[in-house]
């Protein structure tokens, strides 16, 4: 490296721009200086800057895919309470989050259970993990996507709109139950399911089991056909647990009903306020009792005077 001819930095910068190597463009001067000082062979220098370019491309790709995925914020596998949903195997979920074979086959994931059981959280968390592992994901409320597809149908662009969704390895349809039992809505949903069958994967969250899907699809034949396509090559999670939101609300209520038993620096003011409130209530009660007693004595005296 020491005997290399002088490099025109401006020319090299232009070349790297043309080659679309922004990380190398930024990093090469520092690594070139280090290579000169430490006597790196040319192959090592090229290897190091190429690795940094690939790492930066991965970072930018994940950033782009996260932006397009529309995932709800804060939903990760680390924050999912697996202990509250014992029927869901954490090991199985982690294997699913890696993607690989099931996405390549166009297999599906179906999550059933009552509202508040963590279906949407788990679906979004799996989606996030898949993006980090190099897959493309889109998360949408089923009603919103169906409305977009209806607009595309009116504009004679339904086939094109469905084809554009092929770029996503996984399409997450959240809250299937809220699609209205309307022929126009359910027909475009069925066409989407049919178009992705064994080609691209779908993940669905729903409050009702398959036996109640006649509330979504008005035509029994369409219901049967949709279920058949979804369950073929599918993994099904039945998350029949108490609502997480309800559990949290009840726990918060219980916590509010438990006053601190001793004062600390942090809660001393709260303890004093509580005690003052109790004192005021006691005084008010005493005054009320005195007033009642006075009124009683007055009535007795009045009767005696008669």
List each language-model region with its residue ranges:
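Short hinge/gating elements
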Residues: 11-14, 30-34, 79, 108-112, ...
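Interdomain "pre-motor" coupling segment immediately N-terminal to P-loop NTPase/helicase cores
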Residues: 13, 17, 21-73
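N-terminal nucleic-acid engagement/recognition segments and initiation subdomains in replication
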Residues: 1-40, 290-292, 296-306
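Conserved phosphate/pyrophosphate-binding and hydrolysis machinery centered on Walker-type P-loop NTPases
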Residues: 2-6, 17-21, 35-43, 70-71, ...
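AAA+ P-loop ATPase motor domain of ring mechanoenzymes
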Residues: 47-104, 243-256, 279
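Non-catalytic alpha-helical coupling and interface elements of nucleotide-dependent molecular machines
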Residues: 21, 33, 51-55, 85, ...
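Conserved P-loop
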Residues: 88-167, 216
């Amino acid at each position: 490296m020491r005997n290399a001819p002088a490099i025109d930095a401006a020319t090299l910068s232009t070349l790297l721009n043309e080659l679309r190597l922004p990380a190398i463009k930024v990093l090469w001067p520092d690594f070139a200086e280090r290579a000169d000082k430490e006597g790196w062979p040319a192959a090592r220098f090229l290897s190091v800057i190429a690795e940094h370019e690939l790492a930066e491309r991965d970072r930018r790709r994940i950033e782009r895919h996260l932006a397009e995925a529309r995932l709800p914020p804060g939903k990760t596998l680390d924050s999912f309470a697996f202990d509250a949903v014992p029927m869901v195997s954490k090991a199985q979920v982690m294997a699913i989050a890696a993607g690989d074979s099931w996405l390549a086959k166009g297999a599906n994931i179906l999550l059933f259970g009552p509202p508040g059981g963590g279906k949407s959280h788990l679906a979004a968390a799996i989606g996030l993990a898949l993006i980090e592992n190099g897959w493309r994901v889109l998360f949408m409320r089923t009603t919103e996507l169906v409305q977009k597809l209806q607009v595309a149908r009116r504009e004679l662009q339904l086939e094109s709109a469905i084809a554009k969704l092929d770029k996503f390895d996984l399409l997450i349809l959240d809250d299937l139950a809220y699609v209205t039992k309307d022929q126009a809505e359910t027909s475009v949903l069925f066409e989407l399911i049919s178009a992705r069958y064994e080609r691209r994967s779908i993940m669905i969250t729903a409050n009702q089991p398959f036996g109640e899907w006649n509330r979504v699809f008005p035509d029994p034949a369409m219901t049967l056909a949709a279920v058949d396509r979804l369950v073929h090559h599918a993994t099904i999670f039945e998350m029949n647990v108490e609502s997480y939101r309800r559990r949290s609300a009840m726990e918060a209520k219980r916590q509010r009903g438990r006053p601190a038993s001793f004062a600390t620096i942090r809660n001393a003011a709260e303890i004093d306020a509580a005690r003052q409130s109790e004192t005021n209530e006691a005084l008010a009660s005493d005054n009320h009792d005195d007033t009642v007693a006075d009124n009683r004595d007055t009535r007795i005296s009045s009767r005696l005077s008669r």
